Amino acid sequence: MRSSAASDVYKRQDIANASSLHSLRYADSDAPLNTEYQLRSINAVIDEVITDPVLAKVLVGNLPLYAAEKDKTPFSTHAFIMDFYNQSAFRVRGGSDSIATALVDTINRYGGEVLTRQKVTRIVCDDTHAVGVEVDGGEMLPCDIVISDAHPMRTLELLDTRLIRPAFRRRINHIPQTVGGFSVYLHFKENTVPYLNYNYYGYQGDTPWDCERYTEQSWPKGFLYMHFCPETDTPYASTGVILSYMQMADVEQWKGTAPGRRGQAYEDFKRRKAERLLDVLEEHFPGIRSGIQNYYTSTPLTYLDYTGTEGGSMYGNARDIGLGSAGRVPQRTRIPNLYLTGQNINSHGMLGVLVGTVVTCSELLTAKTIYEQIKKAGE
């Protein structure tokens, strides 16, 4: 068992290290990476190198981090994300919003300005380039370069120009999406729930796979439970979250309604799902209910309305070995000064946001310059 696990670890490390983006070693191309591991599924590779069936399931126990699907998600996605988490900090003290705050502070320090509560309603183009963005259907903000981290489908909806070919729009609109999520955000009673410095992945069946395929009776088939890292050293958690897969179809009837105004039936639906998820958590952590002061929830509709991600998906576009290049979204567009970034152009989740940013910025500053700056900042 030990040698099998080591084989999986070494294979993941080799694939991650072969990428100049993940290793921050500049190379003209990542030819070794464009091989079988982008074309073979996670389960196919693991079943090949892991002989113990229980160990094979353990190694993919954190599937909710990237919503992998059996026979579809490439092993390279698993390798990059696992290597990223193995090498990085696993929690952000005080919550992840501190990352956004630090980014805003940096932008301000360099003379930039961050505008909030101003919705971009159109990317304005002339015959050859993007010339600015329209905000709230009125104000025009001139731009030399436009970078969009919105879902690619949302970005295309902002473009009324012949510079984007209909074939490209059709291809982007037909890329499958990852599954949505139902979250229960927990507020614990003070000094009641011991802080967990790890994520907990719970499953009601004997496999982490196929949790996105459920019925009303079988939901939830799996869940992720974690505590948010407190700002001060304390043995107790103040907040946490439970996350389980949820298809957009479950909340489709309320699509088009406004947040906070979806009606009592929607509130009853969320409460029923939350209570069921809490019942499952109680089975894994007996007594946890007594430590919860209150909770609130989110559904795929929440993701759709607040982030614009298609279908309320957690991680945007799905990676599918069956699609090949048709399932990839480039950072460049046919509009020379319009770029895409974020989790849809490279990888999923937090890793996708980080590497998507590097890939897009490399178009403006070169990859070599970006890698050198990152390395210097880490010295």
Give the role of each language-model region:
Residues 27-70:
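Active-site-adjacent segment of FAD-dependent monooxygenases/related oxidoreductases
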Residues 54-66, 283-347:
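A glycine-rich dinucleotide-binding beta-alpha-beta segment and adjacent secondary-structure elements
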Residues 125, 366-379:
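Active-site-proximal substrate-binding core of FAD-dependent oxidoreductases
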Residues 191-298:
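C-terminal segments that line or cap access tunnels to active or ligand-binding sites in enzymes
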